[in-house]
């Protein structure tokens, strides 16, 4: 489910704030986001802004056409043709988009890391810890039933984004899906703590390229390698479960929902094409 909505999540900010305005002022938005964690110097902002402009040009010319191609494929999918295998193919393609973007920005992450002072590193780690604590607070003291309720609300919201209001049979599947999921909230809390430690070690090695780059590569491209055996097992189970239930829900789509999906895909395609102009 997570990778199926990668494209939607990555573009949601653009739509909410005015697509072209955000895209053509992306450097400002990225800097503003980073400064939620650490204040940058004027020189750091200038360098980062220049790099983001270059990346945006690459993204517009090289990547957006690939997104449009995938949306065209999605528009051809019907409830009758949807299968777990087809779903998986779309996931793999979306993940490839994400990895290409990571590969493009990796040198700039290294460049920015080298410019950080020791105090900025400390501030960044504290900001990361604050964010992780907010996640932990959302689940503090919740029962398993309440957590499954959160899962249900999240699943329902994301599915309805693409299909519109669900039918009773689909709502029942969503309930079964959420109730069947293995709870990972506390495993993610532990994982976040480990990642925070890894990021701190990474940044403390920012002047040692031979140590920094392999660790950065692992964090960017192999985050699953930091999963505990228990979390890895739960994630694999929940992913397979999500694929199965989502396909069943799609297969039950009526004409209204099919049209809703087609409209969503068409809207995203228009957004992407507009960004290229």
Residues covered by each model-derived region:
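Mid-chain, structured segments of secreted extracytoplasmic proteins
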Residues: 65-103
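C-terminal motif of bacterial Sec signal peptides marking the signal peptidase cleavage site
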Residues: 14-16
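A cross-kingdom marker for long, charged
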Residues: 196, 200-277
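Short, structured motif recognition centered on aromatic/hydrophobic residues
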Residues: 34, 48, 102-116, 124, ...
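Bacterial signal peptide processing site
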Residues: 18-20
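Extended amphipathic alpha-helical interaction segments
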Residues: 110-228
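Start-of-domain marker
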Residues: 22-70, 74
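Positively charged n-region of N-terminal signal peptides that target proteins for export
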Residues: 1-4
């Amino acid at each position: 489910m997570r990778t199926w909505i990668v494209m939607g999540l990555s573009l949601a900010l653009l739509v909410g704030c005015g697509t072209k305005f955000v895209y053509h002022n992306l450097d400002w938005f990225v800097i503003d986001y980073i400064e939620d964690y650490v204040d940058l110097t004027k020189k750091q902002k200038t360098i980062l802004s220049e790099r983001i402009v270059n990346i945006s040009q690459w993204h517009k010319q090289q990547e957006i056409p690939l997104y449009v191609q995938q949306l065209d494929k999605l528009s051809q999918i019907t409830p009758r043709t949807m299968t777990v295998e087809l779903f998986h193919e779309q996931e793999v393609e979306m993940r490839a988009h994400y990895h290409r973007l990571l590969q493009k920005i990796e040198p700039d992450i290294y460049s920015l890391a080298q410019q950080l002072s020791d105090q900025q590193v400390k501030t960044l780690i504290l900001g990361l810890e604050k964010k992780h604590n907010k996640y932990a607070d959302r689940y503090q003291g919740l029962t398993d039933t309440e957590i499954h309720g959160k899962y249900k609300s999240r699943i329902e919201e994301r599915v309805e984004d693409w299909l519109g209001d669900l039918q009773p049979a689909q709502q029942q599947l969503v309930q079964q899906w959420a109730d069947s999921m293995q709870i990972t909230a506390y495993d993610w809390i532990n994982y976040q703590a480990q990642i925070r430690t890894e990021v701190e070690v990474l940044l403390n090695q920012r002047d040692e390229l031979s140590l920094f780059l392999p660790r950065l590569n692992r964090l960017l491209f192999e985050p699953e390698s930091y999963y505990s055996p228990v979390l890895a097992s739960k994630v694999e189970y929940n992913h397979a479960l999500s694929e199965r239930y989502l396909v069943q829900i799609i297969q039950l789509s009526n004409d209204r929902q099919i049209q809703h999906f087609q409209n969503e895909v068409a809207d995203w395609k228009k957004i992407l094409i507009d960004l290229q102009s």
